[in-house]
Structures are given as C-alpha cells and as structure tokens.
Amino acid sequence: RYRTIVASDRLTLSESFRRAGWSTVCVAPANTYAWPEGDWYGFDTVYDSRNLGYAGPKFGWTTMPDQYTLTAFERLEHGRADRGPIMAELDLLSSHFPWDSIPEMIDWDAVGDGAAFAGMPERVDVPDEPRDAYRMSIEYSLTALFTYLERHGTDDTVVIYLGDHQPATTVTGPDASHDVPVTIVAKDPAVLDRIDAWQWTDGLKPAPDAPVWPMESFRDRFLTAYGPNGS
C-alpha cells in the first residue's frame, strides 16, 4: 500500500503548504538512510539521524531524545531569523516501543549537541510493567513538546499532534481499536474557531462521544476549514 500511494498523484497536506509558498520540512530522526519519497510528500528539506547533529547516546531503539529533536529543529529551521512561514512534520520517537530506555528532561540550555545525555540510558530507572513504562514515555514526550512550545511558540504557532498508531498489545490489550487521539493547539482563538463544526472536545483528552474519522479524511477537512473559503 505504501508503494501504491507514493506512486500516485494524491495531494499531500505538506505539498499543499508548499504550493502555497510555505517552506516544508520533515524531521525524521528514526531514518538512518536516504528517503527519496520525501519529495513526493512535498518536503523541501528532510532531516534524519545523519544530519541532525546528534552526538549523544541512543536510547534503545530511539536514535535521539525528543528534547534534542526539538532543539535541533529550533536551531536548523524554526529559530532562523531569515525564515518565512514554515510547515514541519516532526517525528518524536521517545514514546516508541519497547520503552526499555526512556530519557529525562534536562535544562534546555544544556542540550547542545546531545553530549549532555551521556550515561542517561543506563541511569534512568524504567518500570518493568509495560503500561507503566509506556505512561512514563508519554509523559516525557509531551513534556518535551509542551515546554518547547512555551519557550519557542509564537502567536502564530499552530501544532497538530497525534500518534500514528496505538501502542503494542502489551499496553492496550488484545481487542483495542485503531483509534488515536489528535489535538490542535494554537494561541490564537480564531484558529480554533475555524473548526467549531468538527465538534472536537476541548482539551487534550477526547470525550467518549468525540467524532472518529479515518486518518485519510483529515487533509480535506483541514484544507476546507483553513482555506480561503473556510468559515
């Protein structure tokens, strides 16, 4: 299915931003080799584990902590004085299975090239129970994201964050659905007013009766809400 989609002419959300004159960036620290499909997705620039400048240790499967990924994005793209409007996809890895090595937050000013994380994978005590370890990883990942936004978000910043799939069955149990929560965060109330008709739950936790959509439907709903004819 992946080969089928990248051989198609489907318009991606990132390509839509590129056509509108935005700079489009993908930060994919899990990638350890070239990803030519990035151009099909509409990304002007792709960063991966080879060019993000990380000099610290791996955390199990994870090539670098989320706090470093966000720091590198700020240094390389978002914090540049000469940049225009930017649309970026950032893949945050620290909550990914198997949760056997989870980072801790450090002072943002100490992150540097990641050398400050030396010894942390061995030092941090991770719970043996998978659900507890998963919860710890989610707490870390969201803390990294939210504190980054507190430091570097602006009045114009809009964040859409979601998981691309549910965790392993050791956490969810055998009968879990494929549903994942998605949240839009913005300082400008007008941004959220555009999606009132979606009937999403305020806050970070969807209500039991919150609408459930296929992920592929998000593009059209988003472009309709925020396009020139959006309400």
Region spans (language model):
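Solvent-exposed soluble domains appended to multi-pass membrane proteins
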Residues: 1-231
